[in-house]
Amino acid sequence: MAASLTLMTSPPCSRSSKSPSPSPSPSLSCNQQQQYKPLLHHQWPPQISLKKEKSNESIVAKSPVIAAATKGGSPSVQEQKWIHEGVITESLPNGMFWVKLDNCEDLVLGYISGRIRRSFIRVLPGDRVKIEVSRYDSTRGRITYRLRNNKDATTT
């Protein structure tokens, strides 16, 4: 027990100085060199790897952070919306409309999506539309498609 205490209390490195008086910066001499490992295992900035996809032969750059985030089963934006069909009852300024949903008597305040705006698709009261309603606020939605006639309305 005493031998183990002396081994535990003896320092692994011995101080060597030229004078017996303590110097401000003594040098350490060790038999074993300790290698320090970095605390972070990844490098900054992240290394970007370029690889070709076989499906469309385009080069896709993925960083390790983005690739790790997409591997998980995170829900996409489309899963957080309910898609309904309805009839526009009233037109409001700035591309907003009151939409009456088919499955219930609810009125939803809908705004025109960017694709419909970009394509200059005219939406008027009385038109049938597809609307994405948010799960978090069921009184608002995005008008994503204007149904042209009864054939489009029945083939959803």
From Swiss-Prot:
Protein keywords: Chloroplast, Initiation factor, Plastid, Protein biosynthesis, Transit peptide
Subcellular locations according to the entry: Plastid, Chloroplast
Listed Low complexity bias regions: 10-20
Region of interest (Disordered), residue spans: 1-35
Gene Ontology CC terms: chloroplast; cytosol
Entry-linked Pfam families: eIF-1a (PF01176)
A GO term, aspect molecular function: translation initiation factor activity
Residues covered by the S1-like domain: 72-148
Main location: plastid
Stretch forming the transit peptide: 1-49
SUPFAM superfamilies in alphabetical order: Nucleic acid-binding proteins
Stated family: Belongs to the IF-1 family.
Summary of the function given for this chain in its UniProt record: One of the essential components for the initiation of protein synthesis. Stabilizes the binding of IF-2 and IF-3 on the 30S subunit to which N-formylmethionyl-tRNA(fMet) subsequently binds. Helps modulate mRNA selection, yielding the 30S pre-initiation complex (PIC). Upon addition of the 50S ribosomal subunit IF-1, IF-2 and IF-3 are released leaving the mature 70S translation initiation complex.
Quaternary structure note: Component of the 30S ribosomal translation pre-initiation complex which assembles on the 30S ribosome in the order IF-2 and IF-3, IF-1 and N-formylmethionyl-tRNA(fMet); mRNA recruitment can occur at any time during PIC assembly.
HAMAP family membership: IF_1
Protein name: Translation initiation factor IF-1, chloroplastic
Gene this protein is translated from: infA
